[in-house]
UniProtKB/Swiss-Prot annotation:
The lineage of its organism: Eukaryota, Metazoa, Chordata, Craniata, Vertebrata. GO terms for biological process: signal transduction. It comes from the Eukaryota. Belongs to the G-protein coupled receptor 1 family. This is Olfactory receptor 1S1. CDD domains: 7tmA_OR1_7-like. The gene is OR1S1. PROSITE patterns: G_PROTEIN_RECEP_F1_2 (PS50262).
Length: 325
């Protein structure tokens, strides 16, 4: 992390030269009243703990149960890791700021936070698309599943997803550190996000916004299209199953993932395609909370409640811990 911050500082100095630049940002958060701050602290601390524990249990259960050592659950374990990392990237700093009554964050820390927020949003998107394809193969081509979705292929897809996420985040970061912020350093947000930072800059952000639009649209459209057509084929295949038990088994395999997909893209449509024209800053905050806090917290419940294999693995893990006491 220190090396990354040093890299940001060097890059910033190269592009900005001797011009006066800011050294920190002020995060305004949600409310200014102290009583609201205390409520926010308790609320976000609770959601943070639930998210870390829930997703952590999924990762441990998958790693300990050899039956779940398949590409399907490799993707789920990585999604849980990304969810833990996503909420840990923003919420702890916000909680510290509330307790210390300090709203400042250094320039390097802010850009680093922005970098990782992009990584985790993109990886979530890519993993959801990859998981949809995995479910398509499992339901529509069950006899060829072990051939089409070999463990090495699952690992390759995971590595590619993480690689692309970091490349996209690095691209936005390298473009951002070339911008000047003059004397404007107040962010109407609870963490450093790309869109509010671009609005704050006093430089020309046309290239940044163009790259954000093109890359962002590509990152959304490709996984969404893959998920959409995968589930169209899955639904058609399930409807052709004659037995009720067979239909239920197919639904339990992909139902939890479909719920997460609908939640994820429903959030995108609701927040970014139908934004509030009167309070655009509130829209940014709502979108950030849904992506970085609410969705990561809900995901473990969806996967554990609606996935038979996952429920069995979690039950084994809990029983093992109880018996060891």
């Amino acid at each position: 992390m220190k090396t990354f911050s040093s890299f940001l500082q060097i890059g910033r100095n190269m592009h900005q030269g001797n011009q006066t630049t800011i050294t920190e940002f002020i995060l305004l958060g949600f409310f200014k009243q102290d009583e609201h701050q205390n409520l926010l602290f308790v609320l976000f601390l609770g959601m943070y703990l639930v998210t870390v524990i829930g997703n952590g249990l999924i990762i441990v259960a998958i790693s300990l149960d050899t039956y779940l050592h398949t590409p399907m659950y490799l993707f789920l374990a990585n999604l849980s890791f990304a969810d833990i990392s996503s909420i840990s990237n923003s919420v702890p700093k916000m909680l510290v700021n509330i307790q210390t009554k300090s709203q400042s964050i250094s320039y390097e820390s802010c850009i680093t936070q922005m970098y990782f927020s992009i990584v985790f949003v993109v990886i979530d998107n890519l993993l959801l698309g990859t998981m949809a394809y995995d479910h398509f193969v499992a339901i529509c081509h069950p006899l060829n599943y072990t051939i089409l979705m070999r463990p090495r292929f699952g690992i390759l897809l995971t590595v590619i997803s993480w690689f692309l996420s970091n490349i996209i985040a690095l691209t936005h970061t390298l473009l951002l550190i070339q911008l000047l912020f003059c004397n404007h350093n107040t962010l109407p947000h609870f963490f450093c996000d790309l869109a509010p930072l671009l609005k704050l800059s006093c430089s020309d952000t046309l290239i940044n916004e163009l790259v954000l639009f093109i890359v962002g649209l590509s990152v959304i459209i490709f996984p969404f299209t893959l998920s959409f057509f995968s589930y169209v084929c899955i639904i058609r295949a399930v409807l052709r199953v004659s037995s009720t038990q067979g239909k239920w088994k197919a639904f339990s395999t992909c139902g939890s993932h479909l719920t997460v997909v609908l939640l994820f893209y429903g959030t995108i449509v609701g927040v970014y395609f139908f934004p509030s024209s009167t309070h655009p800053e509130d829209t940014d905050k709502i979108g950030a909370v849904l992506f970085t806090v609410v969705t990561p917290m809900i995901n473990p419940f969806i996967y554990s409640l609606r996935n038979k294999d996952m429920k069995g693995a979690l039950r084994k893990l809990i029983n093992r811990k109880i018996s060891s006491l």
